[in-house]
Each structure stands twice: as structure tokens, then as C-alpha cells.
Amino acid sequence: HDGCHFSYEGYKEFANRILPLVSRDFYDENTSSIITPPQLLNTYYSGKKEITLTFDQKIKIEFEYEHNGLKHLMKDQFFFSFDNRKPFINKVIEKLEFKNDQIIIHLNTNQKFLNITWLPNKDYLNTNDVYNGPWITGLNNNIGALSFDNRSINK
């Protein structure tokens, strides 16, 4: 995609992903599989330098994505703030891990943040390259997670 338009294959994939939702919502079809994107339910400090994000389904994350010879790390796609202003602080994550429906963020600082954002920009930071990953996706359906902006981190 070019940041706005998809190729034929992209629109075909979009149709394949939306069909189960339309079938459920407009035609009362039942499904035995998860057909929705992962949605963040809770964010809390689970340790002195650890934040846990809990989603509504099992997830997986891409730890890195290489584009034009540059590695883009998932841990650099999260932003934090100390107050209710827009989160802008990044590069404070030592490592990430995921387990079932959770992402565990290990911080490299003792600072306590109030809010967190995972909202990839149209372009990678400080580039004109369209964002193409890394992603958070559903483990069983491979649908990209809903981004979240300025979510409170519970103590």
C-alpha cells in the first residue's frame, strides 16, 4: 500500500477480513472462531519496572520489522507520558514479551508513567517510509490489534 490505497491483493484481504463481521452483524451468522481484532482491556504496573497490557484474546507481536535496510523495533513504537498530555516519551523499554493475552513491558527506568500509547504513525519516526510493521496481531486470526492512545496505566 502507499499509505492510503491498497493493491488488488490488499483490498481482497480487507474483504476477507470484513466478511465474517458483516455476516455476523447483518445476517446473524454464528462463528466458532475469533473474528475481531485484539482490543486492549487493561494496562497496569505489574512490577517496579514492569507494565502489563491485557487484551481480549491471545496475541502475538513482531519484535522487529526491516524496511529499506533499517530495523524498526516494536519496543520503540510505544510512547509514555507523566501527565495527561499526549504521550511522547519512547526508548524507555528494555524488552518486551508476550504470553497468551498479555504483553509484558520491561522498562529501563524507574520512572512511573501515567499513560501509554501504541499508535503507529503513517510513517516511521523521522522518515518518509510508510509504516508496515512491526504489528500486534491476534494469535488465532492474525488480525492487527486496535491501536490505543493515551491509555491510563493503573497502579
Language model feature labels by segment:
Residues 2-54:
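Histidine-centered active-site loop/cap adjacent to the catalytic His
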Residues 113-120:
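Short, aromatic- and glycine-rich surface loops/edge beta-strands on solvent-exposed regions
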Residues 120-137:
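Short acidic/polar inter-strand loop motif in beta-rich domains
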Residues 91-113:
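A surface-exposed beta-strand-loop module
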Residues 108-112, 133-155:
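Mixed-charge, low-complexity segments
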Residues 47-76, 80-84, 107-109:
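A short glycine/threonine-centered beta-strand motif
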Residues 88:
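Aromatic- and glycine-rich beta-strand/loop motifs that create alpha-glucan
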